[in-house]
Amino acid sequence: MSSSPTPDGVTPAEELPVEPVPTPSSFARAMILVTVSICTMLYALTVTIVNVALPQLQGALSATPDQIAWVVTLNVIATAVVTPMTGWLVSRLGERPLLLWAISGFAASTLLCATATSLETLLLYRIAQGAFGAPIVPLSQSILLVNFTGKDRPMAQGFFGMTVVVGPAVGPALGGYFAEAHDWRWVFYLIVPLCAVAFLLVITFIRPASKEQSAKLDWTGFLALSFAIICMQLLVDRGERFDWFASREIIFYACGAALAFYLFIVHTLTSDAPFLNPQLFKDRNFALGLILVFIYGMLNFTPITLLPPMLHDLKGYPDSLIGLLLAMRGLGMVIGFFTAGRLGWLDPRVTFFVGMVLNGISGFLLAAANVDVSPDAIAWAGVLQGIGSGMMWVPLVTMSFATLPDRFMPDGSAIFHLLRNFGTSIFISISFMVVVRTARMNYAEFAENITPYKESLRFPVVTGAWDLETVEGLARIGDEMDRQAQMVGYDNAFIMYAIVCFLSLPLLLLVRVKRG
């Protein structure tokens, strides 16, 4: 929460004399970049690294699939609730102390997760982990944006962006290796040394900055926004599992989110000191950037969420090969970030346009896959998608924060990453809904055309080893129909992915770019 305007329109930050801050040297700025990147990476890794250990966790803690899902859900909810508080926490503690507290709490809660002996204690520690980790990414980006301006910002954002996006991409591979070689506890132990390194780097290279005047927390706005966030996150996480609005629980979440969000907006527009300063959203580029980062969140993690179950269930690929194919996407991201950083002189709308088009093309390539698709085809589509995502991130940050005043950076960065995470959660849920429902429809269509009385299916060249006269033969062909129907479901999800890419392009026409 940034300092809110007083009735005469002057913010408390403007009333206080601000001492000029000396410009850091090139080496100091380079170390600031390394520091905030490592801080971000240690949090970004935990976003996906735990997912691969869920089967082990379920067995070790004697939990049902629905119960073990809360290990992910509660962590995401805690992160989403605390993220908007980053600006207010900065005004109370300062950037450097807050970052140190966040890293310390994150390390302690991660270590406790590794020592959990019951599902209840693990869930409690995961909530703490999400809450302490929430300020790390927006705070790191805020520090970066203040220290890198002008022509230096694109290259710095390119390096920083790799840790934001590549971390979750390599998380499953690392988590899978340590979970198989040791056990699920090592998924958490792995993060602790990174926390220690990040803590030492922050102490050494992040300078204490002058605090803004401490602002009171707008509890009404905070609680309304928090309740809306909790309901929305539960809705998207549990919607498909409970058949969406056929469930009273999901209807309650939807109504609760709508009501709480309405109260938050009304309170923000009428309060003298709201939780989020409305001046944030008066910046045209930042407001458009929030829409674009929501779309970016929709696109970025969806492929790496859809591909593992598709390749494992329909192709029978081992986890090692799936991890390698996902790593190819990470390689593409590195290329994309580096390319976007080197193209800092180019209109950021052009770079973003190219990245979005590459994402759309990769979506159509994956949508053309069938059950006989080769690993090479998946790898090529992944590289292309990675390059596109990398090329989108740098100009997205450049456009969004180009005209936002420094005093709004903590709040702006927090909302920016909150919407990115929401976009990811919502689109992944929608994508799996498309997979499940269209697969069910296609299975029904296949079944209409597969009967023992159809003459064309009596030829050996068609049936192969299937004997339609036996129960076993019918079961085998039923399994194959299910496999083909699921493949069509995944294809439909990737078609939707590609369509979203191309339909989003006209938004770039609304972005204004400073000339000269």
What are the residue ranges of the model-derived segments?
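Cytosolic juxtamembrane N-terminal segment immediately preceding the first transmembrane helix
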Residues: 2-43
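Flexible interhelical linker loops that connect adjacent transmembrane helices
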Residues: 19-23, 151, 199-226, 241-246, ...
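Hydrophobic transmembrane architecture of multi-pass small-molecule transporters
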Residues: 22, 197, 415, 420-510
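12-transmembrane solute porter fold
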Residues: 29-45, 50-54, 61-80, 87, ...
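Membrane-embedded alpha-helical segments in integral membrane proteins
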Residues: 51, 55, 68, 109-113, ...
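Helix-loop-helix hairpins in multi-pass membrane proteins, especially solute transporters
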Residues: 76, 83-221
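Transmembrane helix-loop junctions in multipass membrane proteins, especially transporters and channels
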Residues: 118, 180, 203-212, 241-242, ...
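C-terminal membrane-cytosol helix-exit motif in multi-pass small-molecule transporters
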Residues: 192-211, 226-238, 256-270, 505-512
